[in-house]
A protein has these predicted regions:
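Conserved structural elements of the adenylate-forming
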Residues: 45-53, 175-201, 206, 212
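Conserved pre-ATP/AMP-binding loop-to-beta segment of ANL
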Residues: 21-24, 147-164, 170-171, 197-208
Length: 235
């Protein structure tokens, strides 16, 4: 890729599936099996397509509907992030460590069509199930579905992500972000790398680097946006 992609559609169909299908997208450890799983970009893309099928077949008129993610960091979190966006839904990453009062306030504002969760109790599981039980679905539900044969670009300036602030000065505010908002930040980072071309061999993957952030954080959302040129780094 000669430049950072500007749409999620291109990131998946061009980056993951055509240019770098055999490169490593993720490596993650599963405590139950004591194993490290390696996922290639082509495999990640197939799981994203499965999520598109899942959401579009279970949410009536899925376009513009809110899908909340309530989970710890995981491979499934990233799959559902990209899948919800490509299904035309509005992604709502949520801080699972917030109090029920804070969380319920955000959910009332959002009016979600689905809440994807890892099923763990972060302190509000009982209240969550009582209030939104019919909307709760496991994070790995996409695995039961076939990959979508076709993907379609989303509106570049349409609402794509609704991200809540930390609420340090009061109740959390929902920040409305479009595809243009998110990918413009990635293009800035790409431009900085291009200026360092005389110091970095841009034909090779960058050295491994680490970011310790929850996936509901804006910085982590940007970091996990597909950027196959440094895809040999462990995610």
């Amino acid at each position: 890729m000669e430049k950072f992609v500007s749409t999620m559609y291109d990131a998946i169909t061009q980056g993951m599936e055509k240019e770098f299908p055999e490169r490593v997208a993720f490596r993650y450890y599963t405590e139950e099996t004591d194993m490290v799983t390696t996922v290639l970009f082509k495999e990640l893309a197939q799981d994203v397509r499965r999520t598109v099928t899942y959401l579009q077949s279970t949410i009536p008129d899925a376009k513009g509907k809110k899908v909340c993610l309530l989970s710890k960091n995981s491979y499934e979190y990233v799959v559902n992030t990209f899948g919800a966006i490509m299904a035309g839904c509005v992604l709502v990453p949520m801080n699972q460590r917030k109090s029920w009062a804070e969380m319920s306030h955000e959910l009332e504002l959002v009016e979600p069509a689905a809440i994807l969760t890892d099923g763990e109790d972060y302190g509000s599981k009982e209240q969550l199930e009582a209030a939104y039980g019919s909307l709760l679905h496991p994070m790995d539900e996409f695995r039961r579905y076939e990959p979508a044969a076709e993907l379609h670009p989303i509106g570049h300036d349409d609402l794509m992500v609704l991200m809540f602030t930390s609420g340090t000065t009061g109740l959390s505010k929902g920040v409305m972000m479009s595809e243009r908002n998110l990918f413009s930040a990635g293009q800035v980072l790409w431009a900085i790398s291009a200026q360092l071309a005389d110091k970095i061999d841009l034909t090779k993957p960058l050295p491994g680097h680490y970011m310790v952030l929850p996936m509901f954080h804006l910085g982590c959302l940007l970091y996990t946006s597909p950027s196959p040129r440094d895809s040999t780094s462990s995610r």
